[in-house]
From Swiss-Prot:
Names of the cofactor(s): FMN
Domain of life, source organism: Bacteria
Comment on bound cofactor: Binds 1 FMN per subunit.
InterPro entries: Flavodoxin_fold (IPR003680), Flavoprotein-like_sf (IPR029039), FMN-dep_NADH:Q_OxRdtase_AzoR1 (IPR050104), NADH:quinone_OxRdtase_FMN_depd (IPR023048)
Protein name from the UniProt record: FMN-dependent NADH:quinone oxidoreductase
GO MF terms held by the record: electron transfer activity; FMN binding; oxidoreductase activity, acting on NAD(P)H as acceptor; oxidoreductase activity, acting on NAD(P)H, quinone or similar compound as acceptor
UniProt keyword terms in alphabetical order: Flavoprotein, FMN, NAD, Oxidoreductase
UniProt enzyme class: oxidoreductase
Alphabetized Pfam families for the sequence: Flavodoxin_2 (PF02525)
UniProt organism field: Bradyrhizobium sp. (strain BTAi1 / ATCC BAA-1182)
Family label: Belongs to the azoreductase type 1 family.
Cross-referenced HAMAP family: Azoreductase_type1 (MF_01216)
């Protein structure tokens, strides 16, 4: 089976989401050696944001070399996603949402006829059967029931987007409060890794 591993944190070595996404992938591979892993670091190799030229080229308009290269990058991203059985995404919360690098990747996936279609009764997701696991880190506490829950446009957005594509199995391995001191940070990471181990079992 194929596993797509995505990282989007700009924090590098100190990134909690990178630590957690790597842990999730390691646990999955430990449980099943047959995984074929494709890795994309959206910070080391960022995708450009959508342009009018890119959209026009997808519809058959003439394109210069730069736009053709951009289209090729988008098609490669789409192929990786469509081929994957499981997608593990390192997605920190930045300013209540997701990193712009991750948003650029997501924008390459929302393509009518590829990942969703419009039917008689509205949009229909075409990616049923896939599984998404999100390694989520937040400096504060934003989970349901917290005073800041209404500001969560990170996990809620990802849940909505992948659900729109027809993916029903979406899990979050969450470390919250990682900016609230070393003790809270350590406990949050340990709890997230414990949850990851249960998901991979």
């Amino acid at each position: 089976m194929k596993l797509l591993h995505i990282d989007s944190s700009i924090a590098g070595v100190g990134s909690v989401t990178r630590e957690l996404s790597a842990e999730i992938v390691a646990l999955l591979k430990g449980a099943d050696k047959s995984w074929n892993v494709i890795y994309r670091d959206l910070v080391a190799e960022p995708l450009s944001h959508l342009t009018g030229g890119y959209l026009a080229a997808l519809q058959g308009a003439p394109a210069d070399q730069a736009v053709q290269a951009d289209v090729g990058a988008g098609l490669a991203v789409m192929e990786d996603f469509l081929a994957a059985d499981v997608i593990v995404i390192g997605a920190p919360m930045y300013n209540f949402g997701v990193p712009s690098q991750l948003k650029a990747w997501i924008d390459r996936l929302a393509v009518p006829g590829k990942t969703f279609s419009y039917g008689e009764h509205g949009p229909v997701g075409l990616c049923k059967g896939k599984k998404v696991i999100v390694a989520s880190a937040r400096g504060g506490i934003f989970s349901a029931g917290s005073p800041l829950a209404a500001l969560d446009h990170q996990e809620n957005y990802l849940l909505s987007f992948f659900g729109f594509l027809g993916i029903a199995e979406i899990s979050f391995v969450r470390a919250e409060g990682v900016a609230l001191g070393p003790v809270v940070r350590a406990k949050a990471i340990a709890a997230a890794k414990e949850h990851a181990a249960k998901l991979a079992a």
